Regions:
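Short, polar loop motifs at secondary-structure junctions
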Residues: 125-128
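P-loop NTPase catalytic core of nucleic-acid-dependent motor ATPases
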Residues: 1-77, 140-144, 168-171
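Short helix/loop capping segments that flank catalytic or ligand/cofactor-binding pockets
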Residues: 39, 84-86, 130-132, 150
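Conserved phosphate-binding loops in nucleotide/dinucleotide-binding enzymes
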Residues: 150-161
């Protein structure tokens, strides 16, 4: 039911903002064609978090140096779950999603344990989405609709450029 998914997603996004530091035990996996507004919408959410929000790619996910995740409350993984060979990364991703502590390993510094408050959203445009177990409760997979009229996205980007992320935060 699209309405139930919409309401679940809004609550999933609101909960960490209303309860700073809470670690959700699920990640959102947005899947759908290019041009459906995934980056635009979640970019606005990331803007609310300011320096505590981050975006990462496949290379950063696979790197032994994960300092990019240090201190983050919200993370966007752009196209990090779209390759069939990503199966070997599933354990790492599960830990990122559910563990309350994680090791942070920055280059030329000793590794350290840090509280994990980072709630994750992953994007994929491709059909060969990550291998998920049918009973895996860690992901909410949301299939986006086909792209809307381009004017909708232009209007949204204009609104965001005019303080829309701050308005969204107070909505």
């Amino acid at each position: 039911n699209p309405r139930e998914i919409y309401e679940w997603l809004l609550k999933w996004l609101a909960c960490p903002m209303q309860n700073p530091g809470i670690k959700m035990q699920t990640a959102v996996l947005m899947h759908g064609p290019e041009g459906t507004g995934k980056n635009t919408f979640f970019g606005a959410i990331r803007a609310i978090y300011e320096r505590y929000g981050g975006i990462f790619d496949q290379v950063q996910l696979e790197s032994q140096f994960n300092g990019i995740f240090s201190g983050k409350l919200f993370g966007i993984g752009n196209e990090v779950v779209s390759r069939a060979e990503l199966y070997h990364q599933q354990g790492r991703m599960r830990n990122m999603i559910t563990e309350t502590e994680w090791p942070i390993n920055e280059k030329n510094l000793p590794a350290r344990m840090e509280q994990n408050h980072c709630n994750m959203v992953f994007f994929s445009n491709r059909i060969d989405i990550a291998k998920l177990d049918p009973d895996d409760r860690r992901y909410c997979v949301i299939w986006t609709p086909e792209p809307a009229d381009p004017s909708l996205y232009l209007e949204a980007k204009s609104e965001l450029a005019d303080g829309g992320a701050a308005a969204l935060h107070w909505h």
